[in-house]
Amino acid sequence: MEERDVIQEARTTITLLQTAFSKGFTPSLDALRFRENLDQMLKGLRKARRVDNRLLIEMEKFYQTASLLIGLGGLALNEEAFQAWRAYDHWHYEVVKPQLQVYGPTVVL
């Protein structure tokens, strides 16, 4: 897969998630954090010129934060937003995780 394709695919899936989330947006602290997380990731993707480990780490940070807000936080997604999240989740595990390089000691639990 070409590098620009990864950036464009990420931008597309996150934009779809943002659009679906905005339709059923109910103000809460977790919802505002999620919206801020989406905006920050899209800003980073607009600046990205190529896929490198820095970008992949940013995408992983986005994924981890969003997962925490959706799974353990008080963020309730509407059905469309949840389906968009599942699509991004699947794409993230298929594309980002295999390319991500982790440096330093890691512990297998």
Where are these regions (language model features)?
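Eukaryote-specific, cytoplasm-facing alpha-helical/coiled-coil scaffolding segments in long proteins
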Residues: 38-44, 90-93
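Short, intrinsically disordered, low-complexity terminal segments
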Residues: 7, 17, 28, 45, ...
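Short, positively charged, low-complexity/disordered linker segments
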Residues: 44-60, 103
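Amphipathic alpha-helical binding modules
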Residues: 63-109
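Short, charged, amphipathic alpha-helical segments
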Residues: 29-39, 56-60, 82-86
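Short terminal alpha-helical segments
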Residues: 1-39, 105-106
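Alpha-helical repeat scaffolds in large eukaryotic proteins
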Residues: 15-18, 22, 43-46, 64-67, ...
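Charged, low-complexity interaction regions
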Residues: 20-32, 47-53, 74-78
